[in-house]
Structures are given as structure tokens and as C-alpha cells.
Amino acid sequence: MAALKQLVQSAAKGSRAWLGSTVMALSCICASAQAQDLLVRNATVHTASARGSLQNADVLVQGGIIRAVGSGLSAPAGATVVEANGRPLTPALFGGITETGIEEVLVETSTVDSSLKMSDQPLRPEFDVTLAYNPASVLIPVTRLEGIGFTALGATPGGGFVAGQGGVMRLDGSIDPIGPRALFLRIGAAASELTGHSRAAQWMLLQQMIDEARGQVAADSPHALLTPAGRRALSRYLAGQGRIVVEVDRAADIRQLLRWATREKVKIAIAGASEAWQVAPELAAAHVPVFVDVLANLPASFDQIGATLENAARLQRAGVAVSFVQRGDATHNARKMRQLAGNAVANGLPWADGLAGLTRVPAQAFGVADQIGSIEPGKRADLVLWEGDPLDVAHYAEQVWLGGRAMPMRSRQTELRDRYLQRNAQP
């Protein structure tokens, strides 16, 4: 009660915008049982499934689950009916590989939990950033306003090239990830300073880690790299229980990675992937999904000399499953994911594949496509009704539903905007 009193007093002193955004986030946490029956009627339903796009279609939601997709569906008694009038309805979008909920202010270290910096024992694959996830982060409403309903929470390298584990978080106030964990690591020039300034050292260290996880190196060896917990964590990925996401750009490194994945029989995905188009047939044959940094069309390093705006389109034509990723401030700019998909479409990627890269493909890559990523009966009702083309940044999301619950279409940013649009507004 004392803490609540202090919070209210703080709000009275001018923190109402912060309080409002926090209450919004907390309301999502507390409303998990409040999903109502819903019928969205006469929408252009982009299912992101084999059914494609359906004109003048209805979507029926009961108990937070999509129950039917078709025409002329009847609303159950008490259901909320939304007349779409032909506007687009899509699955909730993917926000990319981010630190949403584990990074609030990048320069304030007390709010950043995405990396582990331990110089004496830098290789800790058991490090799991989902344990630090804050569903009340003020970034979540900001991100959700743009139609984004889930993100891959990713560990970032701190003291070692193996960053740690993450997982898929739905932005509905849930505190737990869905689906299996993913392991994140970095290969190439970007990891050079973490591995003795040599790519060869990266593969050497990775191989020793695998040998340890498989019990080929004694746990008490003075040369051991992993803790017992680290060995157990890595062994799960070697058994196929989760995907290893590798940030890599250079074509030669991607080829080496494909050989390694085939030899060790592990499931991988590639992120960044500036020169992936040069290895497209091999990636397609190995069924490796690629998360493309679409706007990386200039060589920021020698690993990216082959960068091109047509990367995503060339990969798609070769049969590679393509999604998107941002490098830089992906967390605070998750809303730009639609722009990345739109740019890929402008440079040759088919529109349907652009949408799939924001919905079905990442859900499949992270092992949650049985729950989210498409509009199909039996899936969670994570939906977005759009004012116009969702891949055109000139248009916007009118309403987001997660698990059938209408999400508040406001954030701390919009509340500050509305406050200071008023004449003589005071801070």
C-alpha cells in the first residue's frame, strides 16, 4: 500500500503520462481472462496461409481462438461485431529480433538486460534473456500500435560470440515466452574481437563447445569452456530442440555455417545475411530461413561487399524462406519492420511474401506457427485491422487484437502528443 501511495503521489506531481502508459501495460497483464467473442465482417483477409487473400471474408473468434474463416458467418450472442468494409485484416506482425522488454533506455545500464559481460567465463549458452522480460515496458504499447503482436527476444553478444538464449514473446502482457528457446550467436568480422581476431578461432571454439556438450571433454578439464548448465543448454540444440540463430553476412562464412549445421545436424537460421543471395541455392536446399536486413545495401564492412537492396527478392526466387531484421536500434524502432518489408517489395519481393516475412515465416522459424503467424481456425486470434496497405507506412493499424482482446491503441508517446497539442499545456 505504501508503494501504491508513493506511485499516486508521483503521478500527482506530473508523472501522469508515465502512469497512464504503465497502467495500459499492466491492464493487458491483468486481462488475460477477458477475451470476448468477436466477429470481423467483410474484410479483405490476408491469411498468410495457403488460402492466400480472401475478399469480403469474415473471421470468427471465440475464447481467444480463431474458430472460422469464411463468408456469411453468424455472430454468437453477445459477440462484438466489427464491420471492416473491405479493409485489410492480417495476422499480428513480427517485430523482429529485438530487446523489447529487456531494454528500456540503452544508455541507462540498469534497464538493459540483453547481454552478459563476464570476461573470466564469456561462453554461457545457458544465459536466458527471457527471464528478465518486463511485460510492463513502455516500449510495448509503442510497438503494438504499429500492428506488431510478437517479437523474438534475442540475446546480444557481451563478452563472447555466443550471446545466449531468447524466445518468442507475445506483446499482450504475458510474462512467459511461447514455443522453444532459440540460441543466438555471431560469426564473422563482427565477432572478431570476441574470438581472438580470427574467424578460424570462432569455429575452433564452437567445435570445442559441441564436444563438451556431447561429453567428449571432461567437465573438470582445466581447458573446459562451458559450465555444466551450459553443456545441458547446448545439448538441447544439438538434439534439435530449438533453433540456433546466427548473425552472419559474408558468403564464405555462410557456406561454412551450412557445412557445420549439416555435419552437426542442428537447425539454424541466418540473421543480417548481406551476401546471402550469393548462397541462395544452398540455403534453399538446406531449408534455412533468412532474416534479411533489407536496408543494408551499402558495404558497412568487408563482410558486406555484396550487399544489395534485391537480397530478399533473390533469396525468395531461389526458394528461401525470407523474413526481416533490423540492426542498430531495432528495439526502439520495431515499428520500422513494415518499412523493411515494403522496401523489399519495392525491390522485387512479391507482396504476399513481404507479408509472410512479417507473419508466417518468423513464426515457422521459431517453432510457434501452430499458435500464431496466420489466420486459420485453431490459431490464437492475434489480428490487425488496417486503414490501408499494411506494407505502406503511409497507412496505419486501426485496431490490434491479441488473443481476441482489443489492445489499447495508445501509448506514452501518443498521450504526450495529445497533452502538448493543447494550448497552454503544462509539463
Model feature map: region roles:
Residues 18-30:
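Bacterial N-terminal signal peptides
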Residues 136-139, 144-268, 396:
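Polyanionic/metal-chelating signatures
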Residues 43, 47, 54-57, 376-420:
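C-terminal cap of metal-dependent C-N hydrolases
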Residues 105-106, 113-119, 126, 243, ...:
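His/Asp/Glu-enriched, well-ordered alpha-helical/loop segment
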Residues 45, 49-90:
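Histidine-rich, glycine-flanked metal-binding segment
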Residues 33-35:
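Boundary at the C-terminal end of the N-terminal hydrophobic targeting segment
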Residues 1-14:
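N-terminal secretory signal peptides that target proteins for export/translocation
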